[in-house]
From Swiss-Prot:
SUPFAM superfamilies: C2 domain (Calcium/lipid-binding domain, CaLB)
BP-aspect Gene Ontology terms: abscisic acid-activated signaling pathway; positive regulation of abscisic acid-activated signaling pathway; positive regulation of GTPase activity; response to abscisic acid
Species: Arabidopsis thaliana (Mouse-ear cress)
The protein's name: Protein C2-DOMAIN ABA-RELATED 9
PANTHER family tied to this protein: PROTEIN C2-DOMAIN ABA-RELATED 4, PROTEIN C2-DOMAIN ABA-RELATED 9
InterPro entries: C2_dom (IPR000008), C2_domain_sf (IPR035892), CAR1-11 (IPR044562)
Residues annotated for Ca(2+) 1 binding in this entry: 22-23, 74, 76, 82
Subunit structure comment from the entry: Binds to PYR/PYL/RCAR abscisic acid intracellular receptors in an ABA-independent manner, both at the plasma membrane and in the nucleus. Interacts with LOT1 in the nuleus; this interaction is repressed by abscisic acid (ABA) and is sensitive to calcium ion Ca(2+), leading to free CAR9 accumulation at the plasma membrane.
Gene: CAR9
């Protein structure tokens, strides 16, 4: 029997910024996002180191501790595709924002709920804001690619409690379905 997912994470892959050159003067980039046994990819944008994908990839989240990996590749016709860098998407702060005891409906549109600064434990290129926008919690982020000389990818995250999903619960409850608690008393 397969466990129900906690929910659905939509990853809107917006664009690449100053991606590495892997062909003679440019690259043909695409993005691959992996989570556990799920692997999704964008279309290839030919001859462009600043591609605009504007694509939405949807992941089913069963365990919030599974890392989400983003890898950019250069499509090659006659040889293997070249890696153009990678990053890990830390979406735990985003999920924690969903747990906050706030009446989100009373917040003004575009209100920042939480800010995450770049640091050694994340791949953020700049501060990222989790906002209440159009009745949803969203997080815009720019990830700095690792293992490459240059390049960033702009994303937006959006959580959905899909049909048949467990959901995230609320911080005030005794136990949330996504983060087990253990009392020591």
């Amino acid at each position: 029997m397969e466990d129900k997912p906690l929910g659905i994470l939509r990853v809107h892959v917006k664009r690449g910024i100053n991606l590495a050159i892997r062909d003679a003067t440019t690259s043909d980039p695409y993005v691959v996002i992996t989570l556990a046994n799920q692997k999704l990819k964008t279309r290839v944008i030919n001859n462009n180191c600043n591609p605009v994908w504007n694509e939405q990839l949807t992941l089913s989240i069963k365990d919030v501790n599974d890392p989400i990996r983003l890898t950019v590749f250069d499509k090659d016709r006659f040889s293997g595709d070249d890696k153009m860098g990678d990053a890990e998407i830390d979406f735990r702060p985003f999920l924690e924002a969903h747990q906050m005891e706030l009446d989100f409906q009373k917040l003004p549109n575009g209100c920042a709920i939480k800010r995450i600064r770049p640091g050694r434990t994340n791949c953020l290129a700049e501060e990222s804001s989790i906002t209440w926008s159009n009745g949803k919690i969203m997080q815009e982020m720019i990830l700095r690619l690792k293992n490459v000389e240059c390049g960033e990818v702009e994303l937006m995250l959006e959580w959905t409690d899909g049909p048949g999903c467990k959901g995230l619960g609320r911080e005030g409850s005794k136990k949330t379905p996504w983060m087990p608690t253990k009392r020591l008393d």
